[in-house]
């Protein structure tokens, strides 16, 4: 419970400032996310006669083709820290001009994935953009947090874009490696998914020391409570396959 509280306090300060004037709300509604990718999130369960070793072997085989980096920008597996590797999430991300949903499903089946796990292959295509604090090309993700959130009435993406930039600038100045994925099914939707990717094991220590108790963190925390609410938050060990 304590860890959850720490995560929640930190992540609510990444959201934005919003004016109380209706004119500002109207202008903010014109600011839309600049989506870069198509995304699919598939929730899966390992079958009773299978295990994590089988899944690891399968994924090692998967990266050998036929789908490659030319087809997939990123393919990640999220494993909850709270269970014994019985459930996981596939996160498939491709460029905005590609949609390989059916090719991906077919490749999984052809390589024998059906014997290892069962997934809810939701065909709803999501769109996203990624933001980095610093160059992370040489780093591996240590863990991720997935938050499912919803804007409050009269609030939207435009209300907190400026604060996102300010937050990333702070991460850069502190040299803290961090990545966010902002995901929506539709830019006009009130619902969105926020994925935080952390690249150092002592990330929480860095944040709690330099940010949590600062004036800026508390100020943006209060602003977030006016903008949106997060319905749930889960922590995952993250494996980048492609």
Regions picked out by a protein language model, each given a short descriptive name:
Residues 1-21:
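Classical Sec-dependent N-terminal signal peptides that target proteins to the secretory pathway
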Residues 17-217, 226-242:
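Short S/T/G/P-rich N-terminal loop/turn motif that feeds into the first structured element of a domain
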